[in-house]
Amino acid sequence: QLGPMPFTPVPPNDPSLVRLLNSDVRCRQWVDSVMQRLTLKERIGQLFIYTIAPQQDKANKELLRKVVEDYKVGGLLFSGGLMQNQVMLTNEAQRMAEVPLMITFDGEWGLAMRLRGTPNFPRNMVLGCIQNDTLIYEYGREVARQCRELGVQVNFAPVADVNINPKNPVINTRSFGESPFNVANKVVAYSKGLEDGGVLSVSKHFP
């Protein structure tokens, strides 16, 4: 069992991914030391994020144990269910993992996209009507705050698609709109809000 990852917790009112990822020498040294100890199979496992439902039944818990302890995956993506279950399973998975897991989430408009009982925000098309992009930035920070409360470190958002293709209706209200300039500005603001809030953002979809 590896020791705890040595890093200075990011204060809620002053989160900084840049400091955590680039400036903390102890963090980088810890990562290097762990990498040197991993077998080839374990290093390959670190490249994978496994999708699992946040359910408390025996079969699901056994599946969680298998992917964490046997396959030694690098991260988890919870999808659907109750917020309380995700929190409990996240804590359980982190206790089992020799290397801290990267907990990811697909929450384009926040936690409510996947989890019941969480704050509900408007779809991106509604947010695309907002002229003040500072509000989109603050929205991103709030989504990040809620993600961190659940132990989520990566949010697969925002959607950067421009809604101009009638043959691709699945995007629809998930897009900030049909203007490339407006979409780009909103994507940057939302991404910066997430990352200043301590959560990595992932713009999508490509190609």
Segments predicted by a language model, with ranges:
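Phosphate/pyrophosphate-binding betaalpha-module
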Residues: 193-205
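Bacterial Sec-dependent N-terminal signal peptides
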Residues: 1-15
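Mature N-terminal segment immediately following signal peptide/propeptide cleavage
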Residues: 23-56
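Enzymes and membrane/adaptor proteins characterized by extended Gly/Ser/Thr/Asp/Glu-rich
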Residues: 53-61, 65-186, 203-207
